[in-house]
């Protein structure tokens, strides 16, 4: 797992404005910071999927918009539709840490042919790693040769 920055003030406020305030222009600097900090040893980039309901609410997938920038800056192929979130789950941030793994169990499906490919999953923030761990499990079952997590920020915990 590679994180560009620590999730702390003022970055936490910027990510919140981006994610919940519709400040899409922030995808460029957030994605650029991530692109500059990662080892470019993967074949494809897969954004963390967002459930349909949350996508309709928000109007965009924050991980996909960041992944577009990272893919462009690193010249690594982007597979935007490789995986889907098939379960409408409560937001991870609203749950106690111990419940987060259970919350995302069987939440993802990956239909893309990833056989033998090294995959980077791009997301905005990593806290417990439960969501990334579950998607990693699904990607490996789909044939990925390896999976790395690339996040803009991680919590100190």
Language model features with spans:
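Conserved PRPP/pyrophosphate-binding segment of the phosphoribosyltransferase/PRPP-pathway fold
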Residues: 1-121, 128-157
């Amino acid at each position: 797992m590679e994180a560009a920055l620590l999730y702390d003030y003022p970055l936490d406020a910027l990510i919140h404005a981006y994610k919940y305030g519709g400040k899409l222009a922030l995808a460029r600097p957030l994605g650029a910071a991530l692109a500059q900090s990662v080892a470019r040893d993967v074949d494809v980039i897969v954004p963390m999927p967002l459930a349909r309901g949350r996508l309709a609410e928000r109007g965009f997938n924050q991980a996909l918009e960041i992944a577009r920038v990272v893919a462009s800056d690193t010249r690594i192929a982007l597979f935007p539709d490789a995986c889907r979130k098939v379960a409408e789950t409560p937001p991870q941030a609203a749950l106690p840490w111990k419940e987060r793994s259970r919350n995302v169990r069987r939440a993802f499906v990956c239909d893309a042919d990833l056989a033998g490919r090294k995959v980077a999953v791009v997301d905005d923030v990593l806290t417990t790693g439960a969501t990334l761990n579950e998607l990693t499990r699904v990607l490996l079952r789909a044939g990925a040769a390896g999976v790395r997590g690339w996040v803009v920020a991680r919590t100190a915990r």
